Each structure stands twice: as C-alpha cells, then as structure tokens.
Regions:
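N-terminal phosphate-binding caps/lids of nucleotide- and nucleic-acid-binding domains
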Residues: 1-178
Length: 178
C-alpha cells in the first residue's frame, strides 16, 4: 500500500507479507493511493483450493471495484490485472459521467436522470430506459451514505416500477444514490 496526497513531497509505504508488516514508513511514491495484491494465498494453500478460475475471480474483483467506483465518483480509480488495464475511471461530477467511464459514454447518454426528496431523504441518480435492459440484477447499484448496499426491498421496488415496461426476465440498469 502506498499513498501520497497531491502536492506532498513524500508519501507513506506499507509492505506486508504473510500477515507481517515488512516495511512501513515515509517513502518516495506516486501521488494518490495504490493497493497492490500479489500471491494472496501463498502461505495458506488450502484457501487457494477454494478459488474459482482466474477469470471468475477477476470478475468478482471487478464487480467490487465497480461498486466502490460508483460510490466514490470523485476518486480516480484504475484497476490492473496481470499488467493489463481493466478499468480506468477518472473523477466524475455526476453518476452519468461515472457510468460513462464504466459502461461507455454511448450508453450513459441514453440514461435518464432521477431525483426527489421526501421526509428528509434525498434521492438522485440515473436509470436506463426500457430499451437498455439486462438479463441480470448486477447493474442495479444502490448507494446509501456513500456506501454501496444490496437491499432486497429497494431493488425489488425498482424492478416492480419497471415491470410494466420490461419482459419478465429483463432488469433495469440504474445507479441510485440516497
């Protein structure tokens, strides 16, 4: 883990191996924060046996990083795997901008902005028109107080709102921030 605030002369570096901190202190590092993970289960091979294929595990990591990226649109997020850039999302001012970096700006241009306030709760976000649907619920993103959440009740409410507009096996794409 390395981190340096913009404009600072130096940053901080922490290197851990096998649950032990090998190095920690001030260091010359790039601006921003970098988390690098290598050989995660080198000293616990039994854990490695439960891993799926590398592609499946990388997909799971990408889903988690995508959720974090949506929840923190003001942060530049870059994900590399095996030396290849998998995700690059510069800071964004709106959920639409962030989704553009993640899913493509052509899709982001089709999204509909939503907002509302009731009882002290404010909602804003973007939803896809019925012509842009998915065969899974993975692209329904709910962010509450800066954290991504999986909430069956909120997800089901969104799906029910779309029910008259989508076939039974199709789901909306949405980012809703509460």
């Amino acid at each position: 883990l390395s981190s340096r605030p913009p404009g600072a002369a130096s940053g901080y570096l922490v290197v851990g191996e096998g649950g032990v901190v090998r190095e920690a202190g001030e260091a010359e590092v790039s601006a921003g924060t970098t988390v690098e993970v290598r050989d995660l289960f080198f000293n616990t091979p039994a854990r490695g046996k439960f891993l799926k294929s590398p592609a499946t595990e990388q997909g799971a990591i990408l889903r988690v990083v995508t959720q974090l990226t949506l929840a923190h649109a003001d942060v530049h997020v870059r994900l590399t795997a095996n030396g290849r850039l998998v995700l690059n999302a510069p800071p964004a001012r709106t959920p639409r901008e962030r989704l553009g970096a993640l899913y493509g700006f052509g899709l982001a241009a089709k999204l509909l902005e939503v907002s509302g306030e009731s009882g002290g709760v404010r909602l804003l976000g973007v939803v896809a028109p019925p012509s842009v649907s998915r065969t899974h619920r993975d692209d329904i993103h709910l962010i509450v107080n800066g954290r991504t959440v999986r909430d069956t009740l909120l997800t089901q409410a969104l799906i029910e709102a779309y029910r008259p507009l989508l076939p039974r096996d199709q789901f909306p794409l949405a980012v809703l921030v509460l």
